[in-house]
C-alpha cells in the first residue's frame, strides 16, 4: 500500500490545522470549565494520537489536488485542517493511492478522518457524519467513442473502467447485465487506458470525471447520470460518540459559507442540488 505522510509542523509551511488558537481559547488543556472538558473529550476521541490524521488520495477535488506549484486543495484536505483548528491539534496529511486504501486506513486506525461517499457498504466499516455534498455519478468517454448516451453503456463488449475498490465498482458490478466492469489501480492509469482505447468509458462521480477529462484530449462526460454520491465525514468505528460534534461542525461550515469556499477553491464540479 502506497502511503505518504505530511506533518503540519510549527515551522516552515504552517497548515491551517496548526494555526494559533483563537484569542481566548488558549493552548490545549490550558482552559478550564465545561467547554474545555468537552473539547478535551472531543480531541481524545477524534485525535487520540495528539494529531489529527487526515486520509487523502490525489486526483479528486473531494480529496486532494496538487497543482504545478505544489499548492494543495481539496475537500478532505481543507476540512481536515479546519477540524484540526477546532480541536487545537496539529494535522497530519496521510496520502494514499486511491479511495479504497483511505477506507482501509480508517479501518486500521491509521487515519482519523476523511471525506468520502457515505455508501451503505462503507457504513458497515466506518461511521459517517450527516452528508455535506451530493455529487452526480456519470461516465467519461474518449474521443470517437461508440458510447453516445448513458443508455448505450450497458451493452455487450463495452468496457467500463472504475477505480479498484470504489463504490462504483460494487454498484455497477451488480447493475450491469452486459457491459464489463474493469477495475483500475489509479486515475492516472484510467486516463492512459482511455487514450489507448483500452476502455470505452470510465465511471465515477462527476467531480472526478471533470478532472479526468482535463487530462484526456477529446474526452467528454455523457449527459445524464446513473446515480448520486453523498459525501460525508468518515471516522473509524468505535468513535461514534463524536458524531454529534462532527455534525455540528459540518452544519456550521455549510451555514457560514466556509464549505462553499472550500468547494470553489477545489474547483469541484458535478454537484447536485440538495
What is the predicted role of each segment?
Residues 14-17:
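C-terminal motif of bacterial Sec signal peptides marking the signal peptidase cleavage site
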Residues 19-21, 27-37, 74-86, 151-159, ...:
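Extended ligand-binding regions for polar small-molecule ligands
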Residues 26-117, 265:
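Extracytoplasmic small-molecule ligand-binding "clamshell" domains
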Residues 51-56, 151-168, 180:
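Short loop->beta-strand "edge-of-pocket" segments that line small-molecule binding or catalytic clefts
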Residues 53, 89-90, 107-116, 158-159, ...:
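Alpha-to-beta junction loops
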Residues 58, 133-144, 206, 210-251, ...:
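Periplasmic-binding protein-like
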Residues 81, 85, 90-154, 220-225:
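Acidic, polar ligand-binding/catalytic clefts
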Residues 93-104, 148, 182-192, 196, ...:
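Short helix-initiation/N-cap motifs at beta->coil->alpha
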Amino acid at each position: 500500500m502506497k502511503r505518504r505522510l505530511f506533518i503540519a509542523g510549527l515551522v516552515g509551511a504552517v497548515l491551517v490545522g496548526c494555526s494559533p488558537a483563537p484569542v481566548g481559547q488558549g493552548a490545549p488543556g490550558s482552559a478550564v470549565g465545561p467547554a474545555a472538558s468537552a473539547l478535551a473529550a472531543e480531541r481524545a476521541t477524534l485525535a487520540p494520537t495528539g494529531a489529527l490524521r487526515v486520509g487523502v488520495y490525489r486526483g479528486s477535488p473531494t480529496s486532494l489536488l496538487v497543482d504545478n506549484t505544489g499548492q494543495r486543495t481539496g475537500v478532505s484536505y481543507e476540512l481536515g485542517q479546519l477540524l484540526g483548528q477546532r480541536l487545537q491539534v496539529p494535522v497530519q496529511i496521510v496520502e494514499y493511492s486511491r479511495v479504497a486504501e483511505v477506507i482501509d486506513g480508517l479501518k486500521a486506525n491509521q487515519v482519523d478522518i476523511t471525506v468520502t461517499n457515505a455508501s451503505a457498504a462503507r457504513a458497515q466499516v466506518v461511521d459517517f457524519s450527516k452528508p455535506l455534498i451530493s455529487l452526480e455519478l456519470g461516465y467519461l468517454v474518449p474521443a470517437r467513442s461508440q458510447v453516445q448516451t448513458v443508455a448505450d453503456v450497458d451493452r455487450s463488449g463495452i468496457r467500463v473502467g472504475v477505480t479498484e475498490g470504489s463504490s462504483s465498482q460494487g454498484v455497477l458490478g451488480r447493475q450491469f447485465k452486459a457491459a464489463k466492469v474493469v477495475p483500475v489501480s489509479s486515475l492516472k492509469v484510467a486516463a492512459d487506458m482511455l487514450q489507448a482505447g483500452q476502455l470505452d468509458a470510465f465511471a465515477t462521480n462527476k467531480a472526478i470525471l471533470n478532472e479526468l477529462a482535463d487530462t484526456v484530449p477529446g474526452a467528454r462526460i455523457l449527459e445524464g447520470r446513473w446515480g448520486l454520491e453523498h459525501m460525508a465525514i468518515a471516522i473509524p468505528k468505535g468513535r461514534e460518540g463524536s458524531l454529534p460534534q462532527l455534525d455540528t461542525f459540518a452544519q456550521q461550515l455549510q451555514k457560514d459559507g466556509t464549505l462553499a469556499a472550500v468547494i470553489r477553491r477545489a474547483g469541484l464540479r458535478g454537484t447536485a442540488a440538495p
